[in-house]
Amino acid sequence: MQSSPLLENLMEALRVLPGVGPKSAQRMAYHLLQRNRSGGVNLAKALSEAMTHIGHCKSCRTFTEEDECAICQNYRRQISGQLCVVEMPADIQAIEQTGQFSGRYFVLMGHLSPLDGIGPREIGLDLLQKRLEEESFQEVILATNPTIEGDATANYIAEMCSIHNIKVTRIAHGIPVGSELEMVDGTSLSHSFVGRRDISL
């Protein structure tokens, strides 16, 4: 049995989402058509408006509808002297939820990966260099992912910062809270020893 062209187009469109294969796309399409047509209409409207109006903050490159995001416009953030470099906009949300950081951000939109043709310009390091030259930062916190590519990216940025005599720190990686040592992989355990800190009494 051949599906209608519109149904095929809907399922194909849903497959652009990460982790959505043919079966999942079919299930979603059938659900919207059978049980939630109003939800489908709202989804289409929200997608259309987001694609049209959401761009990148001119300062930190996160997603926003304004020229500058709310964090970059916040005066208290501006005078903190701290800049946190992350790979993706979702990383900002994760850090903000901790309540431990009150500075500004710079979003790379990825990490260095020469084999994939992703070099410094592709992740905006030229724009980061410009910010380091034009603004006064006392500390740059590198919050890239604890991967080979993330570490390479962090090292590259650390060298950039050294030229400007800016303090550079890297977020600690290691043992997750609540885990047992025997269940932790060797790499994480090694990082936890290297990144150990003093206990204040």
UniProtKB/Swiss-Prot annotation:
<dbReference type="Pfam" id="PF13662">
    <property type="entry name" value="Toprim_4"/>
</dbReference>
<keyword id="KW-0233">DNA recombination</keyword>
<protein>
    <recommendedName>
        <fullName>Recombination protein RecR</fullName>
    </recommendedName>
</protein>
<comment type="function">
    <text>May play a role in DNA repair. It seems to be involved in an RecBC-independent recombinational process of DNA repair. It may act with RecF and RecO.</text>
</comment>
<keyword id="KW-0863">Zinc-finger</keyword>
<keyword id="KW-0479">Metal-binding</keyword>
<dbReference type="GO" id="GO:0006281">
    <property type="term" value="P:DNA repair"/>
</dbReference>
<dbReference type="GO" id="GO:0006310">
    <property type="term" value="P:DNA recombination"/>
</dbReference>
<dbReference type="Pfam" id="PF21175">
    <property type="entry name" value="RecR_C"/>
</dbReference>
<dbReference type="InterPro" id="IPR006171">
    <property type="entry name" value="TOPRIM_dom"/>
</dbReference>
<keyword id="KW-0227">DNA damage</keyword>
<dbReference type="InterPro" id="IPR015967">
    <property type="entry name" value="Rcmb_RecR_Znf"/>
</dbReference>
<dbReference type="GO" id="GO:0008270">
    <property type="term" value="F:zinc ion binding"/>
</dbReference>
<dbReference type="Pfam" id="PF21176">
    <property type="entry name" value="RecR_HhH"/>
</dbReference>
<keyword id="KW-0234">DNA repair</keyword>
<dbReference type="Pfam" id="PF02132">
    <property type="entry name" value="RecR_ZnF"/>
</dbReference>
<dbReference type="GO" id="GO:0003677">
    <property type="term" value="F:DNA binding"/>
</dbReference>
<keyword id="KW-0862">Zinc</keyword>
<feature type="zinc finger region" description="C4-type">
    <location>
        <begin position="57"/>
        <end position="72"/>
    </location>
</feature>
<feature type="domain" description="Toprim">
    <location>
        <begin position="81"/>
        <end position="176"/>
    </location>
</feature>
<dbReference type="InterPro" id="IPR000093">
    <property type="entry name" value="DNA_Rcmb_RecR"/>
</dbReference>
<dbReference type="InterPro" id="IPR034137">
    <property type="entry name" value="TOPRIM_RecR"/>
</dbReference>
<comment type="similarity">
    <text>Belongs to the RecR family.</text>
</comment>
<dbReference type="InterPro" id="IPR023627">
    <property type="entry name" value="Rcmb_RecR"/>
</dbReference>
